[in-house]
Amino acid sequence: MSWIINGASHDWEVVIGLEVHAQIVSNSKLFSGASTEISVDPNSHVALLDVAMPGVLPVTNEYCIVQAVKTALALSCEVKKYSVFDRKNYFYPDLSFGYQITQFYHPIAKNGHIMLDESADNKKIGIARIHIEQDAGKSLHVGDKTCIDFNRAGVALMEIVTDPDLRSPEEAAEYLKKLRIILRYIGACSGDMENGALRCDANVSVRKVGESALGVRSEIKNLNSIKYVAQAIKYEAMRHVEVLESGGKVEQSTLLYDVDTGTTRTMRSKEDVCDYRYFPDPDLLPLEITDEFIASIRDTLPELPMAKMSRYMNDFSLSRYDAVILSSDRDVAEYYDEVMQRNLPGDLVAAWVTGELFGMLNKRGMCISDSPVRADALGDLLRLMVDGTISGKMAKQVFATMFETGKSASKIVEEEGLQQIADEGVLSAMVERVLEKNPDKVQQYKQGKEKLFGYFVGQIMQETKGRANPEVLNALIQSKLSQ
């Protein structure tokens, strides 16, 4: 949904484009054999190439290309058969080469999209291009000194660039959430923004409602959380409107967002393309990608979140809410799918996974991959409940014991004698005894005090320690009281 800012003289439409830098999951860097592990001592994983030592040439890491092609396919992009690495020339202390190896003229993929608002108008956010590039090092400021850690230098990145299709901070946030889910699903990027594995630059401009030409844009760099992306866009759009409404002119610039003040500040004036003097890297051969190579990667793609969500809603009759929760995390979805192999009701399994299981995991700060109750074990428990061996109340008790001990549901039920009593003869005798002991309450019930029905049920549940089958018991009591 478009965000329209009401100014004193005009209504303004916000136009947003995002550039997402996704760190590729790979054991080694893009052009050197150094490890990509960065949570170690500074400058521990640095090859000669990473610090631009003379005489060392780059060698392309094929696995990074595979990951980029996989991402392109997952985002419905056109994978280019011919792709070239270029040099982007600029100076920065943590960029030893004096240039960044990236792709400008011939990126690896173009023309993809992500769908937003599936429940409403299915808005399509275009992805203009995906290109591969190397990351820079990290500057660390200590007092009046600046130290540089080159562990990150040369790590492979994908820059995923949208068309200027986003129209509000909320749409930008939703796009980022969906992109991160997809990247995690296919294993191309961890998506951990707090660790810098996913960073976002937001391009923001405004224009008068009804105009087609784009306004002058500001680029907000290195936003490391979805919340800050939305906040920064909102502030910058309002600033643009304030400048224009007062008769001023928005200057093209590169900005940083200050999370403490909630404002942007100028980092540098925005460069034009010509300032970077792009040209093909003479040390690297072009990438020539075949149809067979693309097909082999396509075969490795998992069922993607949108398709999985639709399947859950169509095949298992799940609500949209449950389908979104279950499909948004690949580990959760695989857990749910494995439980469903027991031919159980889809809504029942969804309720248990998102309710009982998530509740236990959250209390202990655990993720589903660490759950002591595996998917097959939960399936066995729910099968006992569906088959009538134990009641729903008993199932929760058994589940808690399973979580603490790791024992199977059937073993716990056997050891604790929790099997439901469903024998009509046994329960009928109990019902008769309870009614005979309470003739006054039977009379009151027949005179219209129907709440006493729960009293009779409670007496038998107390006698059986909750093991009486509720359906059988209710039917028997109803039958006896109607005589």
UniProtKB/Swiss-Prot annotation:
One BP annotation, GO: translation
Repeat in keyword set: no
EC nos: 6.3.5.-
Top-tier EC class: ligase
Gene Ontology molecular function terms on file: asparaginyl-tRNA synthase (glutamine-hydrolyzing) activity; ATP binding; glutaminyl-tRNA synthase (glutamine-hydrolyzing) activity
Keywords: ATP-binding, Ligase, Nucleotide-binding, Protein biosynthesis
InterPro entries referenced in this protein's UniProt entry, alphabetically: Asn/Gln-tRNA_amidoTrfase_suB/E (IPR017959), Asn/Gln-tRNA_Trfase_suB/E_cat (IPR006075), Asn/Gln_amidotransferase (IPR018027), Asn/Gln_tRNA_amidoTrase-B-like (IPR003789), GatB (IPR004413), GatB_C_1 (IPR042114), GatB_Yqey_C_2 (IPR023168), Gln-tRNA_amidoTrfase_suB_CS (IPR017958)
Domain of life from the UniProt record: Bacteria
Catalysis performed (reactions): L-glutamyl-tRNA(Gln) + L-glutamine + ATP + H2O = L-glutaminyl-tRNA(Gln) + L-glutamate + ADP + phosphate + H(+); L-aspartyl-tRNA(Asn) + L-glutamine + ATP + H2O = L-asparaginyl-tRNA(Asn) + L-glutamate + ADP + phosphate + 2 H(+)
Family named by the database record: Belongs to the GatB/GatE family. GatB subfamily.
Function according to Swiss-Prot or TrEMBL: Allows the formation of correctly charged Asn-tRNA(Asn) or Gln-tRNA(Gln) through the transamidation of misacylated Asp-tRNA(Asn) or Glu-tRNA(Gln) in organisms which lack either or both of asparaginyl-tRNA or glutaminyl-tRNA synthetases. The reaction takes place in the presence of glutamine and ATP through an activated phospho-Asp-tRNA(Asn) or phospho-Glu-tRNA(Gln).
PANTHER family documented for this protein: GLUTAMYL-TRNA GLN AMIDOTRANSFERASE SUBUNIT B MITOCHONDRIAL AND PROKARYOTIC PET112-RELATED (PTHR11659), GLUTAMYL-TRNA(GLN) AMIDOTRANSFERASE SUBUNIT B, MITOCHONDRIAL (PTHR11659:SF0)
Subunit structure: Heterotrimer of A, B and C subunits.
Protein name: Aspartyl/glutamyl-tRNA(Asn/Gln) amidotransferase subunit B
Native organism: Anaplasma phagocytophilum (strain HZ)
